[in-house]
Amino acid sequence: MKNKNVIQKMREKTPLIHCITNYVTINDCANILLSFGASPAMCEAYDEVYDFVSISSALYINLGTLTKEQETAAVLASISAKNHNVPVVIDPVGCPAIKRKVEVINRIAEVGRIDIIKGNIGEIKFLAGMDSETRGVDSLDNGENALDACTQLAKKYNCIVAATGEKDFVSDGKRGSVIKNGTEMLTKVTGAGCMLGALCAATCANFEDKLVSTTAAILSMNIAGEKAYEEAQLPGSFRIALIDNIYMISDEEIWERGNVEWK
């Protein structure tokens, strides 16, 4: 896997990532995409999304603060993505607490397309029909059976599924990876998960093996987080250091420093 130049290929293309995301972390997602080497566009008007998806490299749908207007725009955007062969990443933020979000995911799967679902372990286990522990948008789950949950959900939606926590798990229904990098400080800043979803969209835009591209995105965030914590131990300065280290991250670094178990 060390020969997979996921980040290099992404930066060579500067993919346009169309984001329909939440209002809490929209700026964070835009900035981390820019630092990573992608080009963000935060377009969510219903009358604009169909055309804009057609010129985009990937579509990132984050359900964090889902308004009715965002819901209708996201569904239409997913239809355009299906029609124009644009990969779609969905982050089901808070779905155990707000069941309507599951209906939106199922609607997108029905009329559009889903290439990657990226959530925390509690969200992914909930979507897979397993018992999970969550509080609002946060997971309290210990990660037991997380890879099984990813595998089941990947088979259900025929996509890549990533579950993040103390360890991170990725599956395409047959293959999988377990990632053991990261720092607890990533849980002390708002939007780390949302930013990771944006990175997953960037890496999958021009890379065929989306299990590998998703693993690379998670490694990028986790290792940048580790390095940021070496430089800054307080949340405000850590956030800045995280963006800086994403800017400097490379394929060589993530595969050399990455602690990944392939399944």
From Swiss-Prot:
Q: Which residues bind ATP?
A: K118, T164
Q: Which residues bind substrate?
A: M42, G191
Keyword Metal-binding on this protein?
Answer: yes
Q: Which reaction does it catalyse?
A: 5-(2-hydroxyethyl)-4-methylthiazole + ATP = 4-methyl-5-(2-phosphooxyethyl)-thiazole + ADP + H(+)
**Entry EC number(s):** 2.7.1.50
Family statement: Belongs to the Thz kinase family.
* Cofactor(s) essential for the protein: Mg(2+)
InterPro entries from the UniProt entry: Hyethyz_kinase (IPR000417), Ribokinase-like (IPR029056)
Tell me, what is an example of a GO biological process annotation in this record? thiamine diphosphate biosynthetic process
Q: Which UniProt keywords apply?
A: ATP-binding, Kinase, Magnesium, Metal-binding, Nucleotide-binding, Thiamine biosynthesis, Transferase
* Pathway connected to this protein: Cofactor biosynthesis; thiamine diphosphate biosynthesis; 4-methyl-5-(2-phosphoethyl)-thiazole from 5-(2-hydroxyethyl)-4-methylthiazole: step 1/1
Mind telling me which Gene3D superfamilies this protein's record contains? 3.40.1190.20
One Pfam family of this chain: HK
Species of provenance: Clostridium botulinum (strain Hall / ATCC 3502 / NCTC 13319 / Type A)
Identify a single GO molecular function assigned to this protein.
hydroxyethylthiazole kinase activity
Q: Which CDD domains match?
A: THZ_kinase (cd01170)
**Protein name per its UniProtKB record:** Hydroxyethylthiazole kinase 1
Q: By which gene is this protein encoded? A: thiM1
- What function is annotated for this protein? Catalyzes the phosphorylation of the hydroxyl group of 4-methyl-5-beta-hydroxyethylthiazole (THZ).
